[in-house]
Swiss-Prot record:
Protein name, UniProt field: Probable pectinesterase/pectinesterase inhibitor 25
Site (Transition state stabilizer): Q432
Active site: D433 (proton donor), D454 (nucleophile)
Glycosylation sites: N220, N255, N312, N325, N364, N382, N500, N550, N591, N596
Miscellaneous field: The PMEI region may act as an autoinhibitory domain and prevent untimely PME activity during transport.
Subcellular localization: Secreted, Cell wall
UniProt-recorded Gene Ontology molecular function terms: enzyme inhibitor activity; pectinesterase activity
Cellular component terms per the entry's GO annotation: extracellular region
EC number from the UniProt entry: 3.1.1.11
Role according to the record: Acts in the modification of cell walls via demethylesterification of cell wall pectin.
Source organism of the structure: Arabidopsis thaliana (Mouse-ear cress)
Disulfide bridge positions per record: C447-C467
Compositional bias (Pro residues): 37-72
Amino acid sequence: MKMQTLNFTSSLLFLSFIFLSCALLISSQQSPSQPHSEPPSQLPFEPPVESPFFPPSQPPIFVPPSQPPSLPPSQSQSPSLACKSTPYPKLCRTILNAVKSSPSDPYRYGKFTIKQCLKQASRLSKVITSYARRVESKPGSATAEEIGAVADCGELSELSVNYLETVTTELKTAQVMTAALVEHVNSLLSGVVTNQQTCLDGLVEAKSGFAAAIGSPMGNLTRLYSISLGLVSHALNRNLKRFKASKGKILGGGNSTYREPLETLIKGLRKTCDNDKDCRKTSRNLGELGETSGGSILVSKAVIVGPFKSDNFTTITDAIAAAPNNTRPEDGYFVIYAREGVYEEYIVVPINKKNLMLMGDGINKTIITGNHNVVDGWTTYNCSSFAVVGERFMAVDVTFRNTAGPEKHQAVALRNNAEGSSFYRCSFEGYQDTLYVHSLRQFYRECDIYGTVDFIFGNAAAIFQNCNIYARKPMAKQKNAITAHGRLDPNQNTGISIINCTIKAAPDLAAEPKSAMTFLGRPWKPYSRTVFMQSYISDIVQPVGWLEWNGTIGLDTIYYGEYSNFGPGANTNQRVQWLGYNLLNLAEAMNFTVYNFTMGDTWLPQTDIPFYGGLLSKE
């Protein structure tokens, strides 16, 4: 159906102002350079020389961070030299040369472009918000799909402004440049690039007239984001080599918080709040239910969601709304214990709700479910049963489900664009696009993931450890792809790393194994990056292993890898012969561990979720 479009005059005038006022963006539209497919450059710190492995059940030992010296200015660089680290060197030189007092320090180049990014992102966000309001105020002027896509763009543009403000503040106030800070900055800048592309993809899919009006300015702004990412990432990592990186530490808490092992917290809450018993105990009482031994989690408060009079809330949404805003890691987790039951509510953890822990009674006991999908007019970005944006979110013993079915195509169970988020003993159930690992750094441990087409997809830096990945039976003539990573830029620190997992057929596909072909993944975007390491791969996976997305597009620039997998589907003799496909050696594989890929050893200890920083010992 052909869409009706609004009069774009006012929006175009404002967009033209952006386009003209941003002289640094007016340049020839240069395509990204096409580098050879190579292993990722060395990350902030290498695994210990004496042993490349950590024991499977033990995280690294954490010590108080050393205090590196403040960073002296880097050696001067010309714009031409600095811009070699970006995908758009010609446009980059135009940007830096446009400033009369052009800074010569690479770090200042990056900070200058971030300032420009924030200025233009704020303007673009206002344009999108204004247009969204006009669409909503004129019923019938746009389709439901277009309204949804524009709303997504508004949300994503606001997130990008927030990320850029955070980066600006952190770079301005940092006394020392730790490895953890560098990785956090890189993650947020990578997220900005991803947000922009998600907006554009959604507008195009909705056949929105607004896409044509906003496409050129957004394209230029995307290039600016990409240039800033390249400059900042390169400059910070150069400076980082001046001292040894510090490891993470366990943060202390204030008088209103307490520490206890995660398992003790879980058992204590379930025991104390059994059935309809009074759960209105103080945080201190809950904290004294068990003895602390080894790791622990810092808790500020615990609330209960359930049907009993003694429970604090009847919906998870209300419990989230009651959580404090913008808390810090040292403030502790706000714990939401959702009793066994089916929660038919569409839940969003917004960006201001940080340090939330959602705890259930176990897989298939505490269930969050919905059925929104693309066929019924929802966008892929906004059709999830559960969405999380707030930093440091963690979930334990919960099932996230989308019941739309394969005939409804994209139907997301959980969308995650939360920095430093983690999921432990959770289940994600759907068909196409089950788990949307949208952006930023994520960790999944001992989880079950069910789906058909692209059922782990997005552009996060996501690590899966000890998970079960089940391919379901798709619709006729469909092919299963376990992963579809969306890395857009060679400087993004994103990818999917699957370690010590089990890949096999779900019961419906196991009953008819020849009804559909299953592949490890396909490249959603040109720099897609995915590795399978030390995992069991059943014979459900085709001998070629991987599937192209659109002909040969991206096959030379992606980075797909396998390392030390086993099982009947792990034989690599007949694997694809793409330039971007790699059989990894140990050194290359170590780049995709918790220790190196997401620097999880600097933030996962706060969750007390078990993890290993390296690879499994071969002993």
